């Protein structure tokens, strides 16, 4: 069955766009025509943050940019203002049994997002599957604009959910469409602050999703795809649909322009599917997922579930060299970037690294206002044997155990600043701090005197006002820690006060979701088995 599905998925797209199988980074992810850049490629020397003689904080600009501000400027934010900025995008959601068809292995999730780009190019998503089992969590990191990340965040979960449906459920879906009756609900979305959808193209997206489930019906699989197959094929099929949509004649100008933006921008993606004790993670690009594990002796460790797809990954370099002629070995990766322009080696969209030159030219000559649409009109040097980029994910399976306490998914804006071990340590500290607070209040009746005492203890121990959200704590430390891993209030304030055109030079968009597991529920699976 797998070979049949593989043949179908690879041959369901046009030959012209066939998808192939299979230290710290520069923050600028995509380098377009360098003569058109507002700033040129910058060095790996980090920007400097120095204490000012007057006791404030001075940020010295390290790169050329378009601001007309003075080169040095004084920055101050109160602790209350810092908290307001950091917590604006946070959300916490407890998973109820009614949101899953089986006993939950997930207790709750906490999420937050801090923008560096304007508008922010990251997206995130959480949804439960209503016709099958499972919860899905996703992080989507856009580049060259937010359009592709927005589209993938809206659509990918639907492709996965449809892939997992039984033949009978798919027949019910198709029958409803043919008779113009309401469709079965597919997903229940758990929303975040700032979530939005592209309403103008919803019908187009549904049409392509329908074609996908019609082809699944033609395979006559009673139980649907396995989760691993569903993740693998959903990533590739959605990327193919994104590419096909701009090639099809579209009369509506809004739809046409939006499809162009989605196809020519790009997005990396990392998503997790949790069904009882079964955890699958699919990753394409340089977002990342890790597990926080507590052993029986109380010691904590980090278990990586993904590998970054970039020039620092030797397996990715080998894959790229296998897929292209030996004559291109020295040009596939230049300046630690794919063809010298893109850091991640796997991504949705970015058709300028997938299509032939002829296809790109024919699409862009249809009268689009590409300058107004922020479309890159150039072909990288040494562009001989496309496609160079793929959206095929690496899929990891992990059988959850009682010692697996939490999962962290985040865009590379977090991992550029903190190591895997730092992230686990900070989440563990967050949990310990919350337990300390609860224990003190539980042991003694709460009153104003007790609360004042706790606040004084916190101040004496050097703790800032406790973040109720672990994702917020991670973002706080990502941008506020100095080179020794210590939080500096002045540095944090400076990083949050950067002008829009300068912020991107010092940090990336950061999006984080922390998923907490129910150890008792997970343990019950093993006892029951």
Swiss-Prot record:
Its main location: mitochondrion. It catalyses: O-phospho-L-seryl-[pyruvate dehydrogenase E1 alpha subunit] + H2O = L-seryl-[pyruvate dehydrogenase E1 alpha subunit] + phosphate. Its EC number is 3.1.3.43. GO terms for biological process: signal transduction; T-helper cell differentiation. Belongs to the PP2C family. GO terms for cellular component: mitochondrial matrix; mitochondrion. Binds 2 magnesium ions per subunit. CDD domains: PP2Cc. SMART domains: PP2Cc. Mitochondrial enzyme that catalyzes the dephosphorylation and concomitant reactivation of the alpha subunit of the E1 component of the pyruvate dehydrogenase complex (PDC), thereby stimulating the conversion of pyruvate into acetyl-CoA. Acts as a crucial regulator of T cell metabolism and function, with a particular focus on T-helper Th17. This is [Pyruvate dehydrogenase [acetyl-transferring]]-phosphatase 2, mitochondrial. It is found in: Mitochondrion. Residues 1-66 form a transit peptide. GO terms for molecular function: [pyruvate dehydrogenase (acetyl-transferring)]-phosphatase activity; metal ion binding. The keyword Transit peptide applies. Residues 106-517 form the PPM-type phosphatase domain. InterPro entries: PP2C, PP2C_BS, PPM-type-like_dom_sf, PPM-type_phosphatase-like_dom. Keywords: Hydrolase, Magnesium, Manganese, Metal-binding, Mitochondrion, Protein phosphatase, Transit peptide. Mn(2+) 2 binds at residues 141, 412, 508. Gene3D superfamilies: PPM-type phosphatase domain (3.60.40.10). Mn(2+) 1 binds at residues 141-142. Its cofactor is Mg(2+).
């Amino acid at each position: 069955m797998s070979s049949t599905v593989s043949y179908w998925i690879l041959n369901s797209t046009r030959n012209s766009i066939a998808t192939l199988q299979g230290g710290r980074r520069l923050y600028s992810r995509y380098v377009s025509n360098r003569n058109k850049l507002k700033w040129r490629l910058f060095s790996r020397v980090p920007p400097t943050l120095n204490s000012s003689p007057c006791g404030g904080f001075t940020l010295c600009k390290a790169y050329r940019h378009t601001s007309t501000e003075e080169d040095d400027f004084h920055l101050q934010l109160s602790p209350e203002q810092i908290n307001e900025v950091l917590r604006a995008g946070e959300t916490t959601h407890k998973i109820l049994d009614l949101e899953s068809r089986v006993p939950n292995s997930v207790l709750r999730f906490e999420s937050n997002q801090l923008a560096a780009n304007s508008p922010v190019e990251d997206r995130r998503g959480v949804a439960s599957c209503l016709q099958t089992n499972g919860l899905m969590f996703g992080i989507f990191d856009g580049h060259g604009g937010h359009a592709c990340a927005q589209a993938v965040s809206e659509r990918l979960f639907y492709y996965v959910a449809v892939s997992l449906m039984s033949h009978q459920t798919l027949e019910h879906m198709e029958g409803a469409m043919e008779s113009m009756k309401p469709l079965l609900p597919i997903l229940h979305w758990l929303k975040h602050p700032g979530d939005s959808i592209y309403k103008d193209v919803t019908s187009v997206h549904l049409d392509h999703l329908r074609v996908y489930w019609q082809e699944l019906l033609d395979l006559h699989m009673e139980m649907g795809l396995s989760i691993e197959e569903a993740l693998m094929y959903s990533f590739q099929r959605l990327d193919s649909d994104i590419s096909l949509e701009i090639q099809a004649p579209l009369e509506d100008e809004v739809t046409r322009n939006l499809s162009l933006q989605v196809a020519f921008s790009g997005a990396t993606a990392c998503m997790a599917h949790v069904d009882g004790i079964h955890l699958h993670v699919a990753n394409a690009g340089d977002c990342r997922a890790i597990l926080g594990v507590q052993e029986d002796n109380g010691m904590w460790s980090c278990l990586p579930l993904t590998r970054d797809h970039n020039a620092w990954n030797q397996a990715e370099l080998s894959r790229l060299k296998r897929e292209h002629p030996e004559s291109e070995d020295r040009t596939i990766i230049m300046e630690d970037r794919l063809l010298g322009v893109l850091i991640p080696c796997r991504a949705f969209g970015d058709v300028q690294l997938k299509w032939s030159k002829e296809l790109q030219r024919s699409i862009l000559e249809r009268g689009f206002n590409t300058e107004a649409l922020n479309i890159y009109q150039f072909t990288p040097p040494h562009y001989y044997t496309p496609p160079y980029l793929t959206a095929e994910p690496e899929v990891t399976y992990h059988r959850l155990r009682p010692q697996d306490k939490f999962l962290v998914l985040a865009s590379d804006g977090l991992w550029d600043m903190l190591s895997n071990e730092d992230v686990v340590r900070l989440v563990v500290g967050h949990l310990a701090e919350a337990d300390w607070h609860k224990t003190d209040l539980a042991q003694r009746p709460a009153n104003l005197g007790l609360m004042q005492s706790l606040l004084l203890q916190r101040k004496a121990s050097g703790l800032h006002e406790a973040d109720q959200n672990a994702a917020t704590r991670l973002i706080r430390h990502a941008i506020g820690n100095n080179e020794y891993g210590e939080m500096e209030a002045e540095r944090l304030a400076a990083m949050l006060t950067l002008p829009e055109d300068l912020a991107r030079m010092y940090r990336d968009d950061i999006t984080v979701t922390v998923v907490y597991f129910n150890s008792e529920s997970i343990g019950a699976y093993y006892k029951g088995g």
